[in-house]
């Protein structure tokens, strides 16, 4: 795992370094043309001022007819260090998690504790959305529409629902008073 993380990070740094021509040093100490206008050092002399291409070939900055040296960019450096820190931290966390999982599996510690066994058994639960219910369970008629009869075992609702799936005793459901 470490063997693949380090080359990947090296490749990232190499690709970033080759983009600006400064190599890996450009990642840790980036340069930019941003900054205070009055705090510029001239670069390339009069020839670079007259020829912007010469100024850029010297890796200097050209703006407003002035050729000047790049300066270290602290904001970009901070961003690079932040990204590098999070990348290394993430790789370290991933490697540690994999090693810990592997160690626990080798020591046969990946079983549920005794107090959780049986609590997650979903085979005993009754779903209200189950398609296996009989037609008499799907819709409970109101008390006024049919005469009261002795309930059968299959007709009792034991799901523990709260929205009128079953009635208790002499309660009425949705129908209201229909014995006028």
From Swiss-Prot:
Q: Name one GO biological process term.
A: hematopoietic progenitor cell differentiation
Q: Name one GO cellular component term.
A: inner acrosomal membrane
**Where does the protein principally reside?**
membrane
Q: Which residues form the P-type domain?
A: 31-71
Query: Which cysteines share a disulfide bond?
Result: 33-61, 43-60, 55-67
Please name the Pfam families in this protein's record. Answer: TMEM190
**Protein name, please?**
Transmembrane protein 190
Q: Where is the signal peptide?
A: 1-21
User: What keywords sit in the KW lines?
Assistant: Disulfide bond, Membrane, Signal, Transmembrane, Transmembrane helix
Q: Where is this region: Disordered?
A: 131-180
What residue ranges lie in the Cytoplasmic compartment?
103-180
From which organism does this entry originate?
Bos taurus (Bovine)
**Regions crossing the membrane:** 82-102
Q: Where is the composition biased (Basic and acidic residues)?
A: 131-140
